[in-house]
Amino acid sequence: MEFKHVSVLLNECIEALNIKENGIYVDGTLGGAGHSSHILSNLSKDGMLIGIDQDQDALKAAKEKLKDFENVKYVHSNFYNIDSILNDLDIEKVDGILMDLGVSSYQLDEASRGFSYMKDAPLDMRMNRENDFSAYNIVNNYDEDSLYKIIKDYGEERFAKRIANFIINRRIEKPIETTFELVDIIKAAIPAKMRREGPHPAKRTFQAIRIEVNSELKILNKTIEDGVNRLNKGGRMAIITFHSLEDRIVKLKFRELENPCTCPKEFPMCICGKSPLVKNIAKKGIAPTKEEIEENPRSRSAKLRVIEKL
């Protein structure tokens, strides 16, 4: 299957990065290289793009899309490892970092990946298929309390306790092996009236399991800190999020980096000595235009946040 992915907030990202033609830029989620192709188009031959992705399918597609560009370094890894990646490339500082935290259209549409509740497939959801740990392990091995906590915290699902209980009871009979088996269990756990209203009843639970499989939220804070430390003065970090949990983490971390002072509020002046590391470029975040949402409905929940290194 062809790797298809429509880049979200494309023009906004390119503008936000404030690209220098001879700069070094990192795309931490290379994907189908939609954003990266536009970054490269703004670079001279003296500039460089480092494309990171943990999905080999994505890297293969990106190499094909960017085959006419020579100033690209491809890295099969997770953006969590940005420090060691730059060390291995003997690069100390960069001028911009982009991270698009969404699941690609390809990953959703490729049934075998097990990300979608709309297509039947083995329970998988691994961004990096070289890892052994998958959705199957969570659904069939986690105890009821752990399942409840994940579905509640990562999915913000109001029926998390019932869903966890129904999963436990079903797997007593036999292992839960496919996405549609899990969807049926979730539907049975949610009251009929609630199933008829709002988004697909499995959406939040699938999101929660995917986040747990790929440790998505656990790695964000460290990645932001390490990335900011690697930015040149005036360099920018742009992050696209797709749900409130991610956005909250990014917003709070950006706020902390902009105002790291730990002095009590009643102190008339700062004595902790911690000075701001960044300037927030888009405090409220940047949302897609109405036109973009109409063209690409999956962009509806996207939000772009941007900081600049001081």
Curated annotation (Swiss-Prot):
Where is this chain primarily localised?
cytoplasm
Cellular component annotations (GO), alphabetically ordered: cytoplasm
Query: What reaction gets catalysed by this protein?
Result: cytidine(1402) in 16S rRNA + S-adenosyl-L-methionine = N(4)-methylcytidine(1402) in 16S rRNA + S-adenosyl-L-homocysteine + H(+)
Places the protein is found = Cytoplasm
Keywords per UniProt:
Cytoplasm, Methyltransferase, rRNA processing, S-adenosyl-L-methionine, Transferase
GO MF, one example: rRNA (cytosine-N4-)-methyltransferase activity
The family database entries (InterPro entries) matched by this protein are listed as: RsmH (IPR002903), SAM-dep_MeTrfase_MraW_recog (IPR023397), SAM-dependent_MTases_sf (IPR029063)
Provide the GO biological process annotations.
Answer: rRNA base methylation
Q: Which domain of life is it from?
A: Bacteria
Enzyme Commission number(s): 2.1.1.199
Sequence similarity? Belongs to the methyltransferase superfamily. RsmH family.
Q: What is the name of the protein in this document?
A: Ribosomal RNA small subunit methyltransferase H
The gene behind this protein is: rsmH
